[in-house]
């Protein structure tokens, strides 16, 4: 995964305006998403410059999927999963806004254990889980940043205890060859 600044502040505010214009769709469960407000922009809205900046970043991937907003509020979370659909090649999560009182809601990844050698001065019990996804990682994001990853990343979102966290999810197809 990597963190990038894909959109500028004006585009971020444009995305917030689009989100606020959309009807709230409260989901108790939407596959891996729990207790979120999910909103889909129209095809016309998806043609705005704020979306085009993200689409341009992913221009080497098939433009087969749409964007959607997720607002994480109290008790919201996303369970650990991979986007293992064969058609999904790239995911971009853009952090649009958060409340000042936000507790929880962190982007999470489960990374592979990569240490090949074991220190001689430390004891061990059990086999080394080399290349297994066993390392939990909190991905600290700033408002305006985008988290970019492919379908192999095991990821989730920590449960929100207080406040809210608003993101734009952008899915793209496989790399254009």
Walk through the language-model features, giving the residues of each:
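Catalytic core of non-heme Fe(II) oxygenases with the double-stranded beta-helix
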Residues: 60-177
């Amino acid at each position: 995964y990597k963190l990038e600044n894909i959109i500028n502040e004006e585009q971020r505010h444009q995305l917030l305006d689009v989100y606020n214009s959309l009807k709230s769709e409260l989901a108790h469960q939407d596959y891996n998403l729990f207790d979120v407000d999910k909103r889909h922009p129209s095809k016309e809205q998806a043609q705005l410059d704020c979306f085009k900046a993200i689409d341009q970043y992913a221009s080497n991937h098939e433009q087969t999927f749409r964007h959607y907003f997720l607002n994480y509020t109290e008790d919201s979370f996303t369970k650990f999963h991979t986007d293992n659909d064969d058609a999904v090649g790239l995911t971009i999560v853009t952090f649009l806004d958060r409340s000042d009182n936000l507790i929880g809601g962190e982007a999470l990844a489960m990374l592979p254990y990569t240490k090949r050698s074991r220190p001689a001065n430390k004891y061990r019990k059990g086999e080394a889980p080399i290349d297994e996804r066993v390392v939990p990682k909190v991905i600290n994001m700033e408002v305006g940043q985008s988290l970019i990853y492919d379908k192999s990343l095991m990821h989730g979102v920590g449960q929100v205890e207080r406040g809210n966290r608003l993101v734009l999810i952008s899915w793209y197809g496989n790399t254009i060859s």
